[in-house]
């Protein structure tokens, strides 16, 4: 009986971890009409959070599906428009996970703060999402991201972002 109790407790303890790793991407979604995009806003927020979570594994079909969902939603959204500055390409360094993190971070912040139009704030929040995902990937091999992590810790990220915007 004590073995059964231990097994049950082990399963209960593991269930929050298992729940965190389940992809929030809706199945069979359609993104054509403006109302389609509106109805999936909660899943967009959940997907960005899921992709940024340290427990979400890289290189899986679930992660690829989440990236695809976000890019499709952002590409057609009538309410969110993401601005990709030249520095973003250097920061994401041809890493699709980091690029999707930037796009998702911007979209997530825009959805949660619909009146925010300041490009410094939007770029900074998107960049913070990139830095979180970069750390989750091990935080190696990208000098720009490593530099920005230090600047963020020093509270100097807003100045850096402002200096790297094409329109100030």
What feature does the model see in each segment?
Residues 61-167:
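Mature extracellular/secreted ectodomains of secretory-pathway proteins
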């Amino acid at each position: 009986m004590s073995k059964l109790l231990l097994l049950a407790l082990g399963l209960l303890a593991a269930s929050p971890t298992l729940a965190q790793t389940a992809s929030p991407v809706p199945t069979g979604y359609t993104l054509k009409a403006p109302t389609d995009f509106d109805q999936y806003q909660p899943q967009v927020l959940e997907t960005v959070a899921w992709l940024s979570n340290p427990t979400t594994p890289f290189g899986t079909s679930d992660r690829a599906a989440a990236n695809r969902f976000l890019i499709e939603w952002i590409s057609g959204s009538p309410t969110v428009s993401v601005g990709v500055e030249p520095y973003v390409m250097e920061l994401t360094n041809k890493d699709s996970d980091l690029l999707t993190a930037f796009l998702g971070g911007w979209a997530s912040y825009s959805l949660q703060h619909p009146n925010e139009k300041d490009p410094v704030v939007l770029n900074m929040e998107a960049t913070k999402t990139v830095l979180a995902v970069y750390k989750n990937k091990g935080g190696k091999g990208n000098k720009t991201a490593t530099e920005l992590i230090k600047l963020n810790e020093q509270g100097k990220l807003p100045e850096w972002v402002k200096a790297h915007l094409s329109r100030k």
